[in-house]
Regions:
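Eukaryotic helix-grip
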Residues: 1-214
Length: 214
């Protein structure tokens, strides 16, 4: 497998924790994209692709951090609440757990699929409990490309979660993917602007309905 040597470093987990405390927006042209319903989204142009990287900050009310992390990691449950999932499962490859994810795209666009690895760590930082999940695309021969489905080869996501001091969660998310194919960059960026807040709203509902909730 290629694309993620050593997968995730301690430093990557520390960086996600640090962003939760103090957003790292200086020194680059991060632009405020949208601010609504307690969620703030910034974007940064990735010059080679014409697409944007995104950073999301906010509070998800009514979702305790441990529950939110469990829901985010539970791929079987995601198939029930995420309407865009066509196929989603994990498989052991060379001693590493690898996820396969096919996403429904509206006609006439081709579906996209992802092959990625992810890791969760529950960290104690200055007496704060922080849950961090990192994910990134990899190349794995056990998942050959499918006819009619476009493989996303650039995908990276970070998620850091802690208590908001009440019954909800403070959240930081970093997100970038390049869906490839002949989709105008403006359409991809429009989808990201609308899709991220909608995904977070859906995740709040998923937390409230989680069957394994204690």
């Amino acid at each position: 497998m290629a694309g993620a040597p050593g997968y995730f470093s301690d430093e990557q987990f520390r960086e996600a924790c640090a962003e939760l405390q103090q957003p790292a927006l200086a020194g680059a042209d991060w632009q405020l994209l949208v601010e609504a319903s307690g969620i703030t989204i910034y974007r940064l142009l990735d010059q080679p692709t014409g697409l944007y990287e995104y950073k999301v900050f906010g509070v998800l009310e009514g979702c305790p951090p441990a529950l939110l992390a469990d829901v985010y990691m539970d791929l079987d449950y995601r198939k029930k609440w995420d309407q865009y999932v066509k196929e989603l499962y994990e498989k052991e490859c060379d001693g590493q757990t690898v996820a396969y994810w096919e996403v429904k795209y509206p006609f006439p666009l081709s579906n996209r699929d992802y092959v990625y690895t992810r890791q969760r760590r529950d960290l104690d930082v200055d007496e704060r409990k922080i849950y961090v999940v990192l994910a990134q695309s990899i190349s794995a021969p056990q998942f050959p490309e499918k006819s009619g489905v476009i493989r996303v080869k650039q995908y990276k996501q970070s998620l850091a979660i802690e208590s908001d001091g009440k019954k909800g969660s403070r959240v930081f998310m970093y997100y970038f993917d390049n869906p490839g194919g002949q989709i105008p960059s403006w359409l991809i960026n429009w989808a990201a602007k609308n899709g991220v807040p909608n995904f977070l709203k859906d995740m709040v509902k998923a937390c409230q309905n989680y069957p394994k909730k204690t």
